[in-house]
Regions:
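Nucleic-acid nuclease catalytic cores
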Residues: 2, 15, 19-130
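Nuclease catalytic cores
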Residues: 1-9, 13
């Protein structure tokens, strides 16, 4: 499954660039105030002065909504890069063959309450590691 996602991600990223003007990214970013808070969004752009991100997924199952674990990843990336919105893009496949002509997309808005929880958990973990 991971190999399929790695193979499809550049293709989907090109689609995201063409449709949504978000550039593909493989860069590793750190939060302004905490160099150990890291994120690797799949796409980064500045639209009208605001940072926007993209996160690309492939799945063998239909989604009624974005899985919570992916939402946490998105909120974390928004925190690290100071973004307010992320375009979550996913391609469903059946036996590794895409089921639709185009990927599905949903915008996820920044949620500072969720980000606060995630930052607290990360800081606790880093504190334990520094002991």
């Amino acid at each position: 499954f991971t190999d399929h996602g790695r193979a499809r991600e550049p293709e989907i990223a090109r689609w995201v660039r063409a449709r949504h003007r978000i550039e593909p990214s493989t860069a590793l970013y750190h939060a302004h105030s905490e160099p150990y808070h890291l994120a690797t969004p799949d796409g980064v752009a500045v639209h009208n002065g605001a940072v926007v991100l993209a996160e690309i997924k492939t799945t063998g199952h239909a989604w009624r909504s974005i899985p919570r674990s992916y939402l946490r990843q998105v909120w974390w990336q928004q925190y690290v890069l100071g973004a307010d919105r992320t375009l979550v893009v996913w391609e469903q496949h059946d036996d590794f063959i895409p089921t639709n002509a185009e990927p599905e997309v949903r915008w996820v808005e920044r949620d500072d309450n969720e980000i606060h929880v995630l930052v607290g958990l990360a800081n606790r973990l880093l504190g334990l590691m520094r002991r």
